[in-house]
């Protein structure tokens, strides 16, 4: 079984499937969607929320004091000073110490009781939730691919690996635009790929534009078949923080 995880700026999602099969299934992740209401959903908002004491919210899946998932997304939008958002894009922000407890970002005199986490800490929590859901579904995690923006530098990639290692996931990194092109290849099949290469004299250059919740990722791929099919990323956008809320 192969597991793929997209640790997104706004949402985290995981999928799994047998290596010899085209069948892919999205992982359903149980989460609080309202007070006292738990639902399994395919999208896990990449948000942590520290409830007010008067709210009495307890997340059965998350270490206190934070609430995770859809309810966290809703409440953090209403009281931004109590929410941790966009941890992924902070991983690539060279202007801050990404292992320091800097999130929630900014000073907020009204929410001084909110614990602060580092971008790596927050990312590890989302991955821990995914791993717990995989374990609950009895899906083995010995072959896990974790996607990252092509624009991530080596530091951001190492920090992403650190977050995965903390929660017991041994992963291989794959650039997100390249993962998207692999999916296109799967959809068009061998015939579609052959037509593409025939039309480009055996070598195609593909520009992949990945517009996400916190990053806009551009990659130029070279696809050739001399003598066998190869895919090389020959250029990537330089802008790490194009888009998002920071």
Per-range role (PLM):
Residues 127-132, 185-186, 219-222:
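Short, well-ordered amphipathic alpha-helices
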Residues 132-143, 150-154, 160-205, 211-212, ...:
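Hydrophobic, small-residue-rich alpha-helical packing segments that form membrane-like cores
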Residues 20-167:
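Phosphate-binding loop and its immediate beta->loop->alpha context
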Residues 1-24, 189-232:
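Gly/Thr-rich phosphate-binding beta-strand-loop-beta motif of the actin/hexokinase/Hsp70
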Residues 20-21, 54-55, 151-153, 178-180, ...:
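Conserved nucleotide-binding/hydrolysis micro-motifs of P-loop NTPases
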Residues 40-53, 223-246:
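Glycine-rich phosphate-binding loop plus the immediately following alpha-helix
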Residues 13-15, 57-60, 155-156, 182-183, ...:
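Short helix/loop capping segments that flank catalytic or ligand/cofactor-binding pockets
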